[in-house]
Amino acid sequence: MKALKRWFQNSKLAREWPINLSFLGILPFFFAAGGCLLYTSDSGAYLMTARSLSIPLDRSVFYSLYLRGLNDLMSLFTQPILGEIVVLPPLILLFVGIFQLVKKLFPTLQPSNPEKLDYPLTLIQRWIFLSMWLCACFLTSMPWFLLQAMPDIFTAILCIFVLLFLQTKSLRSSIACALVIIISAVMHNANLITLTVVSIAIWLAWKGYLGKWTHPLNKYVSISKTRSLLALSLIPWALLIGSNIWGGNGVTVGKGSHVFFMGKLCENGILKTYLEDECASKPNPFCAFKDSLPEHTWDFVWNSHGILEKTGGWHHSKELYNQIILGTLSKPKYIALHIQAAISATAQQVVLTHGGDGLTPLDTSATLTQELKLHYPDEYQGFINESKQQKSQIDFDFYNRIYDGSALVLLLGAVFCLYRRPNPLLATFFGIAALFILCNAFSTACFANILARLNARDFWILPMLSIGIIVQYFFATASKQQQPI
């Protein structure tokens, strides 16, 4: 609440109506959460890493660096408020990104400057932008991710700025989009995989390797732009590997990545098959547990008294785990199982679109509470006394029923509008957004966990684009009917 008051009192941006519009959509959910941020069980780890500046075993350090950097910057001028640090930069990036998407994807006969970041829009574009922003706020789960002290909102920002990067023609705007893409990608390990897979898929399609049907798409996105995106996708990998080298973890994306991969092998059943085939001739410590493997990745990774601790733990299991992982990737039988498991996991993940996953009451003696108490006393008091998350007073079932119904109606409506009035530009970028969401489902389901939170964090972009397509269709239809015969 203190962050909100200070924003309206002191910020010049707060006196500009477009930025205020962004707050009008978010405020109801801010109050629905009790005027507090939302937290998951991982939020405390990010805050702790931000203070220690250590390289974690199980996640990217860059979201913690983002929190620490903005905290130190704010402390030069005023008392840092966690709500401002967590919410305002992503909110502005989302607002600007969606604003620019309207200008790029919904051109009119009298367009505003397509490259300059200004506010003037034509009347039709204003209605499209207003409908898209309000849809994102009230008909999708976007606000719940924006209010979380988590890096998940940066996955949606990544998707939006990938769309902008592909459509932008000026060098200056391309550089600006590229910087946002890099920053968003390094916030979460899965974002790196998503960006790389999307970039490869788009480049292959535009090169024609997926069929001649892709050739007409070159008029909307140049082949050179797809190559640039592919090259750009390598930079976050270099940054993440560099951070681990700097932290003494060696040349690796994550020192604990082998643990997560082994957890996935437990979950998809490949490890059990491998052990049944190999234990007789090549026994290893896992053979004693082949009939009692955990059903889910998180059970393997986070059970402090589970198989992980009995087979070396985080620090002494890498050699054994990598030997087994490479063993499952060296024979056609296991490779086929990997492909089958990836398809199945992606299919399960991509339909999980509900908000509120992980936003349950948290242990008040855990790391999160200690970090808030030491460094953000106002947020600590709100978390302890006012947070409706802590009181289980946020009815996510109610909101999710709205989101499900809205998504179904809007997606079907967009497909109908594109069928009745074909728009190759919109269809192309709608397809790219859908591809991004599918690739995010693949990367999170196959290398992390099958959780609604990991898919819903960017799925909301499709309903938002859908309402823009529908509004544009009705404006175009009305304009055609008004033309004299």
Q: Where are the language model's segments positioned?
A:
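Membrane-interface anchor segments at the N-terminal boundary of transmembrane helices
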Residues: 28, 77-88, 341-433, 437
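Short acidic/glycine- and proline-prone juxtamembrane loop motifs at membrane-interface regions
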Residues: 143-154
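Specific aromatic-rich, kink-prone transmembrane helix
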Residues: 154-173, 177, 181, 198-199, ...
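Membrane-proximal stem/loop segments at transmembrane-domain junctions that anchor or position
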Residues: 252-379
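Membrane-interface alpha helices of multi-pass inner-membrane proteins
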Residues: 175-188, 233-240
